[in-house]
């Protein structure tokens, strides 16, 4: 580990020296004391630009010697030099151009659009622009960074800056909280790298670290090196310390390797590889924790205590028509995200997606060949289906007379992780004819389609005998369903009488949908789940996702939306309310279906959404769904948020799901924590108390279970050259199977950051809010 410390420190200091992004994010107060170049920039060859000299006195012996004294001011291009005295000399050298030099003494100040130098004496070769400043100090223009040196040298036509016994800190003048010093520092602007010999890192005036040699990245070029380390303590993992190392492998790909030490479990190695190539861009992450001591003791029967995660995301487009996408996550065991932190999954995830797709699209065709399966984390679930593979082909032809024509077709092969479950091959074709009519105040779309599906089901005998679902699957099934739909919308607009320059709209919508009934009890459920019915869902064609369940429909969906726009055409308010009126009850014939056992007709489902931007700081958003079949409010949510600025946020929210709704939607979930419904109130926020202190917190309480779901509090102290934050989080990670009680993880985090060492000069509260099990989401 000691061998790695020089590289760690080098990368931290290098980021502070020349982080352009950090400059863009600097708080205004951090620019106090930082010099700024306010004059117009002068372009062109500096050697060809005129030199302007002012002085109280001048004496010359042309062309060998000239002496300027008293308030000497010299300007050339973007550079100026002031001193008590400046002596110019010119000496003819054999077979060479005359050597011209300048020596400045007394209160020497050199400034340009890049740097300011001060010292008692300076020397410059006017031919080569080589310059030396003695016993001086420097300050970077326009960003934090300053220091001093016995000698400061400019070499190689300003390519190299050499400091002898030099120092650097990003702290403002008068604050020397930290600094790095070296016997020699060479900064190469072209290669954007700096080398430091005999480097000492100081906290105040006390040296705390020494390295004989450091090489640090500077400028915008990516350089390999350690990033900012992190430390925290939790009841699940014990003390944790991570030190990410960045690898700049090539201009189009790089990697980050992060050893993450956990005192209770061991050392995890997290490797993230990023690439950008002609076939596309993507990211691959592989995390490896060998011999997890906690997992080994809690799951001794498993035998294998190695924990790992593999994640691959790829998005690629070639020749504007070919596309290849990957969304793949796989972990070693179902408890991985409960035990270990990862940005690619959380404790609330019930499964991990593993999908590959390859497609082609042009003006009339859209095709995709995909493979998809799920790694389900519920140990009681053993019926997860995979599509291996699935082919989707869609043909579009618009403006066929007054009609738009489309044909969607699909071929899919379904297999199950459980060998005792059925497998199926599904073929589907769906031609659609649409008549769109529209003008500036309304639209009417009338659509007719035919849905024809063939199933070839295998391995069904054991399922029919033992499943207990009441379904009786058949080997070969054909299902043909026509569908008719007409959807009308209108938009009325008026100027508001009591609010000048404000505009209100009224947008009624009416949709009739008809699908005849077909008994589908002989078809397995391979990729269909019931869909949530919010306001926009009232006008959905389908009650179920996928193709295995297509519910009958003889219904009229109606709704109305009103919006209010201010004088800048920004939406300040909207409210929507609607319902579905069933002329006959929707059915699929599946006796285990969610809604087949209800015979309600009439106004069955109501839904509403609303949003009110009360002011630039206050906003309200909410939604409500009522289902008469359950005789209760099915779902509800409300959010009230005050946002003064990015560092001052306060949000109050509430989420509700009735027990009846949970029972219908998640009938296979047996845990009592779900069966009693969801009623959860939460408050979250971050607040900059004063310029240097900020507080962040979140608290979510489940009123059904009478217990907190997530608790988070953090405090950060921030200055222009260093920051510190301390955080505490207590979150649910699972349930105790013996007594159904909740299991919690208590975690304390502690971070110190040298300001200027990262690209973010904000207070960091957004990251803390996003780290909770229930991350903060903006209301407006």
Curated annotation (Swiss-Prot):
- Record's keyword terms, sorted: Cell outer membrane, Membrane, Signal
Superkingdom of this entry's organism?
Bacteria
Where does the record place it?
Cell outer membrane
Give the signal sequence positions. Answer: 1-24
Question: Matching Gene3D superfamilies, A to Z?
Answer: Lipopolysaccharide (LPS) transport protein A like domain
Gene Ontology annotations of biological process type: Gram-negative-bacterium-type cell outer membrane assembly; lipopolysaccharide transport
- Role, per record: Together with LptE, is involved in the assembly of lipopolysaccharide (LPS) at the surface of the outer membrane.
Sequence similarity: Belongs to the LptD family.
Q: How does it assemble?
A: Component of the lipopolysaccharide transport and assembly complex. Interacts with LptE and LptA.
| Protein name per UniProt | LPS-assembly protein LptD
Organism listed in the record? Sodalis glossinidius (strain morsitans)
């Amino acid at each position: 580990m000691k061998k790695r410390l020089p590289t760690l420190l080098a990368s931290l200091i290098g980021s502070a020296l020349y982080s352009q992004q950090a400059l863009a994010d600097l708080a205004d107060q951090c620019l106090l004391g930082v010099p700024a170049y306010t004059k117009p920039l002068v372009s062109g060859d500096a050697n060809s630009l005129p030199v302007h000299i002012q002085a109280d006195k001048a004496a010359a012996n042309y062309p060998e010697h000239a002496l300027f004294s008293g308030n000497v001011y010299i300007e050339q291009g973007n550079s100026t030099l002031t001193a008590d005295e400046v002596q110019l000399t010119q000496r003819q050298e054999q077979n060479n151009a005359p050597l011209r030099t300048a020596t400045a003494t007394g209160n020497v100040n050199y400034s340009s659009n890049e740097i300011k130098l001060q010292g008692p004496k300076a020397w410059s070769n006017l031919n080569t622009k080589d310059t030396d400043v003695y016993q001086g100090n420097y300050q970077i223009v326009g960003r934090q960074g300053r220091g001093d040196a016995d000698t400061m040298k400019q070499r190689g036509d300003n390519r190299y800056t050499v400091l002898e016994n030099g120092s650097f800190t990003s702290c403002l003048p008068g604050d020397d909280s930290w600094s790095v010093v070296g016997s020699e520092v060479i900064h190469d602007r072209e290669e954007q790298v700096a080398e430091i010999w005999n480097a000492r890192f100081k906290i105040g005036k006390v040296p705390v670290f020494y390295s004989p040699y450091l090489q640090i990245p500077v400028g915008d070029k990516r350089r390999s090196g350690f990033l900012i380390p992190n430390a925290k303590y939790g009841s699940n993992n014990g003390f944790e310390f991570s030190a990410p190392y960045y690898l700049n492998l090539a201009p189009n790909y790089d990697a980050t390797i992060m050893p993450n030490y956990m005192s209770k479990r061991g050392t995890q190695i997290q490797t993230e590889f990023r690439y950008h190539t002609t076939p596309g861009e993507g990211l691959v992450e592989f995390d490896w924790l060998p011999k997890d001591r906690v997992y080994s003791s809690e799951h001794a029967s498993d035998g294998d205590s190695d924990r790992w995660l593999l994640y691959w995301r790829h998005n690629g487009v070639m020749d504007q028509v070919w596309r290849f996408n990957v969304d793949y996550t796989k972990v070693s065991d179902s408890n991985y995200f409960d035990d270990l932190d990862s940005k690619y999954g959380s404790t609330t995830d019930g499964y991990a997606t593993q999908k590959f797709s390859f497609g082609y699209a042009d003006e009339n065709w859209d095709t995709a060949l995909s493979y998809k399966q799920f790694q389900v984390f519920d140990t009681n679930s053993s019926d997860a289906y995979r599509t291996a593979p699935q082919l989707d082909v869609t043909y579009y032809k618009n403006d066929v007379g007054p009609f738009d024509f489309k044909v969607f077709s699909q071929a899919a092969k379904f297999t199950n992780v459980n060998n005792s479950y059925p497998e199926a091959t599904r073929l589907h074709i769906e031609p659609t004819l649409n008549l769109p009519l529209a003008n500036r105040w309304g639209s009417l779309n009338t659509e007719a389609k035919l849905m024809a599906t063939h199933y070839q089901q295998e391995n069904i005998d054991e399922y029919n005998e033992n499943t207990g679902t009441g379904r009786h699957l058949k080997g070969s099934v054909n299902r043909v369903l026509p569908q008719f739909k007409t959807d009308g919308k209108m938009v009325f607009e008026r100027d508001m009488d009591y609010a000048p320059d404000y505009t209100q709209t009224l947008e009624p919508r009416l949709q009739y949908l008809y699908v005849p009934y077909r008994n589908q009890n002989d078809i397995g459920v391979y990729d269909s789940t019931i869909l949530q019915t919010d306001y926009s869902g009232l006008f959905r064609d389908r009650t179920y996702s996928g193709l295995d369940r297509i519910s009958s429909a003889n219904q009229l969906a109606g709704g109305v939306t009103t919006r209010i726009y201010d004088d800048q055409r920004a939406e300040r308010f909207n409210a929507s309310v609607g319902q579905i009126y069933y002329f006959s009850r929707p059915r699929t014939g599946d006796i285990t279906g969610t809604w087949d056992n209800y015979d309600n007709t009439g106004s069955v489902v109501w839904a509403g959404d609303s949003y009110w931007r009360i002011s630039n700081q206050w906003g309200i958003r909410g939604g409500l769904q009522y289902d008469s079949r359950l005789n209760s409010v099915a779902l509800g949510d409300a959010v009230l948020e005050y946002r003064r600025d990015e560092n001052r946020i306060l949000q109050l929210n509430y989420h509700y799901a009735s027990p009846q709704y949970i029972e219908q939607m998640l009938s296979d979930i047996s845990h009592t924590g779900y069966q009693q419904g969801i009623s959860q109130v939460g408050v979250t926020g971050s607040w900059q108390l004063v310029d240097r202190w900020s507080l962040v917190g979140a608290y979510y309480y489940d009123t059904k279970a009478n217990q907190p779901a997530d608790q988070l509090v953090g405090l950060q102290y921030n200055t222009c050259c260093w920051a510190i934050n301390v955080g505490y989080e207590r979150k649910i990670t699972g349930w105790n199977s013996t007594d159904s009680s909740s299991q919690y993880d208590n975690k304390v985090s502690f971070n110190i950051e040298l300001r200027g060492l990262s690209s973010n000069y904000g207070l960091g509260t957004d990251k803390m809010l996003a780290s909770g099990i229930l991350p903060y989401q903006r209301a407006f």
